[in-house]
Amino acid sequence: PQTSNKVAAREWKERLRWKGDLRYRHESFDVEDRRDRTRQRIRARAALIADVNENVEVGFGLATGGDDPASTNQSLGDGFSTKAIQLDLAYARWASPIDGFDVIAGKFNNPFLRIGGNGLLWDGDLNPEGLALAFERGAWFGSAVGLWLNEESRDEDSYLVGVQGGLNADLGDAVALTAGIGYFNLLDLEGRPPIFDGDPRGNTLRADGALAYGY
């Protein structure tokens, strides 16, 4: 029995993977008509990923920072106070019998391709929440999502649906082309306060402080 227990423990150990990173950053701001500012920031992330079987993967991760969905940076200072650790990942991923198709549920890494890591649509630190279907086969890729933005007990929930698809083409002589198209629709946001921290982030507000449009 002891031998079988050791074998089982070793098999489980082989199914577990750790990943993480630590970054220290010095920031300096020199803005006209404002006082110069410097600050020290850290970012620490750690995640445990387990292969439950050949088709199912689950992941759990923690990260520094507050509850800002687009940042895991933590400013140092504040009298040596302890710093917050937040839930950054909690998901299950199922590899379907259809080759190249995966289903993901929970709080997961962004499944959409960000060309050059550009943050025009999606911040690099953002881990969305909801359901996703991811596809990758040969040069072709794609994703479809249903993401929950805000849960309301007395009104319709706000959410996002989106699709993206494209292909990666190797043109030879160290030249590659990535082409794709995407569609994203934010639902039940018009007439609601800005989500998360109340900051409209450039969006138009009505006189009562609610969003004038559905984005």
Name the predicted role of every residue range:
Residues 1-5, 43-47, 143:
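Short intrinsically disordered, low-complexity coil segments enriched in acidic
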Residues 1-35:
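N-terminal periplasmic/intermembrane-space "pro-region" immediately following the signal or transit peptide
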Residues 8, 21, 45-48, 90-93, ...:
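Outer-membrane beta-barrel architecture
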Residues 14, 36-42, 83-88, 125-129, ...:
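Residues that define the transmembrane beta-barrel architecture of outer-membrane proteins
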Residues 19-21, 59-61, 65, 104-106, ...:
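Outer-envelope exported proteins of Gram-negative bacteria
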Residues 25-43, 50-98, 112-123:
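Surface-exposed loop and membrane-interface regions of Gram-negative outer-membrane beta-barrel proteins
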Residues 97-103, 111, 118-215:
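Signature for the C-terminal beta-barrel architecture of outer-membrane proteins
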